[in-house]
Amino acid sequence: MSKKGKKKSKNNSSVDGNRRLAENRQARYEYEILETLETGLELLGTEVKSIRAGKVNLKDGFCLIKKDQIQLHNVHISPHNHAGKFFNHEPLRIKRLLAHRKEIEKLKISLERKGLTIIPLSLYLKGSWIKLKIGVGKGRKTHDKRDREKINDSKRDVANALKRF
């Protein structure tokens, strides 16, 4: 069979070919991200199918380190449509994140010393693997958010003015 008539579908892909499945856009607004880390996820089969279908919400998610393991809490993955109640997963199940021991220790030290938090930023495919980008961040105050909005608005106005001329 020839591939002459086939066209590739357009998807959310970044420069290096990874397909973005979900993104936590609110996290960059509410937190000042100091460091990022790519981790794997320990998932069930129905969770993988739901994530690939884009039925995941990272908005309220956060990570904790317990017993030298990173755990992902409060991330909603909708149940898979074609699986029965017995075989389906729990939507708010706590998921284990896969990272190297040294990376976990580094995160643990920074969380204890500086009072930071770990937030899920984006969920994407890397090859056939589902990866989660987490960020170590410090919460922003309301006035910091307002200042950030003013800076972004002024940059946008300057860019629009330059575009007209």
From Swiss-Prot:
According to its UniProt entry, one GO biological process term is: trans-translation
For this protein, what is any one GO molecular function term? RNA binding
Sorted keywords for this record are:
Cytoplasm, RNA-binding
Q: Which GO terms describe its cellular component?
A: cytosol
Q: Does the keyword Signal apply?
A: no
Q: Which PROSITE patterns match?
A: SSRP
Which cell locations does it reside in? Cytoplasm
Q: Which ranges are annotated Basic residues under compositional bias?
A: 1-10
Q: Which Pfam families does its entry note? A: SmpB (PF01668)
Q: Where is this region: Disordered?
A: 1-21
Which family, according to UniProt? Belongs to the SmpB family.
Function of the molecule = Required for rescue of stalled ribosomes mediated by trans-translation. Binds to transfer-messenger RNA (tmRNA), required for stable association of tmRNA with ribosomes. tmRNA and SmpB together mimic tRNA shape, replacing the anticodon stem-loop with SmpB. tmRNA is encoded by the ssrA gene; the 2 termini fold to resemble tRNA(Ala) and it encodes a 'tag peptide', a short internal open reading frame. During trans-translation Ala-aminoacylated tmRNA acts like a tRNA, entering the A-site of stalled ribosomes, displacing the stalled mRNA.
Kindly give the PANTHER family that the UniProt entry links to this protein. SSRA-BINDING PROTEIN (PTHR30308:SF2), TMRNA-BINDING COMPONENT OF TRANS-TRANSLATION TAGGING COMPLEX (PTHR30308)
Name the UniProt record assigns to this protein: SsrA-binding protein
Cite the source lineage: Bacteria, Bacillati, Cyanobacteriota, Cyanophyceae, Synechococcales
